[in-house]
């Protein structure tokens, strides 16, 4: 079987460079395209050199339609506007679209859902094995404990992160809500400030911290009468997300059209 040909979207960014490095380390995949935003000063530069590798001859381009003509998939950790633009082209080309972009709105998610009748999409707020195991455990614990245990999710990221709560925190919140059998949107408490009143029973709280160079720390706290359960994950290098994205792309290659998650990729969907 020939290598899976992949495009890295946002190839000039931190995650894009990590993806380029991960591809160079992984058997069965090859970098065939590097996408960057129109007008970027990085256009035309070599993706390998930008990632701290020897030159690989793949220059950054803003033309996804041309890049995708000879590709099998795209790895997309960009921003919502770029991801939604990429969704349409990936669907037209019939290539695998792995989406790790965070900060997507409900309307963005509706657009992604609409293309999955003919497109293969793997979407997750976090691509690492550890976080998805944490989500599975969160769901199980939430199922087992009653409303007398309050659920709080605390996350910390580097000072440059532009969205909050993080996609991973929301992933964990969805897992907790699923375990409780409730809708997260109607049970979510975010950004408490001032005279907020007592905590509502059944709420799932979020706290977001920003500072330094933290790759990503997440804790799920179940606070009950006179005892607490804490589940936590600390990411030490964004390469864990890059290798997870590659695992997702290879898993999805040849699958039927649909919207999949890392839980599907890792066999945790029924956990």
UniProtKB/Swiss-Prot annotation:
Regions annotated as coiled coil: none
A GO biological process held by the record: lysine biosynthetic process via diaminopimelate
Catalytic residues (positions): 157, 161
A cellular component term, taken from the record's GO annotations: cytosol
Localization per record: Cytoplasm
UniProt keywords, alphabetically: Amino-acid biosynthesis, Cytoplasm, Diaminopimelate biosynthesis, Lysine biosynthesis, NAD, NADP, Oxidoreductase
Amino acids binding NAD(+): 10-15, 36, 100-102, 124-127
Highest taxon above the source species: Bacteria
SUPFAM superfamilies for this protein: Glyceraldehyde-3-phosphate dehydrogenase-like, C-terminal domain, NAD(P)-binding Rossmann-fold domains
Function: Catalyzes the conversion of 4-hydroxy-tetrahydrodipicolinate (HTPA) to tetrahydrodipicolinate.
The family this protein is said to belong to: Belongs to the DapB family.
Protein name listed in UniProt: 4-hydroxy-tetrahydrodipicolinate reductase
Source organism: Rhodopseudomonas palustris (strain HaA2)
């Amino acid at each position: 079987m020939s290598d899976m040909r992949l495009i890295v979207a946002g190839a000039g960014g931190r995650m894009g460079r990590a993806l380029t490095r991960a591809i160079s380390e992984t058997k069965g995949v090859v970098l065939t395209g590097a996408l960057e935003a129109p007008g970027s000063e990085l256009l035309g530069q070599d993706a390998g050199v930008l990632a701290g590798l020897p030159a690989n001859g793949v220059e950054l381009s803003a033309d996804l339609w041309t890049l995708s003509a000879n590709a099998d998939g795209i790895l997309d950790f960009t921003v919502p506007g770029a991801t939604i633009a990429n969704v349409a082209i990936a669907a037209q080309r019939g290539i695998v679209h792995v989406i790790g972009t965070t900060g997507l709105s409900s309307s963005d998610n509706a657009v992604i859902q609409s293309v999955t009748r003919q497109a293969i999409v793997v979407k997750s707020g976090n691509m690492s094995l550890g976080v998805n195991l944490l989500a599975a455990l969160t769901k199980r614990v939430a199922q087992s404990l009653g409303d007398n245990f309050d659920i709080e999710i605390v996350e910390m990221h580097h000072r440059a992160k532009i969205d909050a709560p993080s996609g991973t925190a929301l992933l964990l919140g969805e897992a907790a809500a699923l375990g409780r059998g409730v809708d997260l949107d109607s049970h979510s408490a975010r950004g408490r400030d001032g005279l907020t009143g007592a905590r509502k029973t059944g709420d799932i709280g979020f706290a977001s911290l920003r500072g330094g160079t933290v790759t990503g720390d997440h804790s799920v706290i179940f606070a009950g009468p006179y005892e607490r359960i804490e589940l936590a994950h600390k990411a030490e290098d964004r390469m864990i997300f890059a290798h997870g994205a590659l695992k997702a792309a290879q898993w999805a290659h040849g699958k039927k059209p649909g919207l999949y998650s890392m839980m599907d990729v890792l066999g945790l969907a029924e956990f």
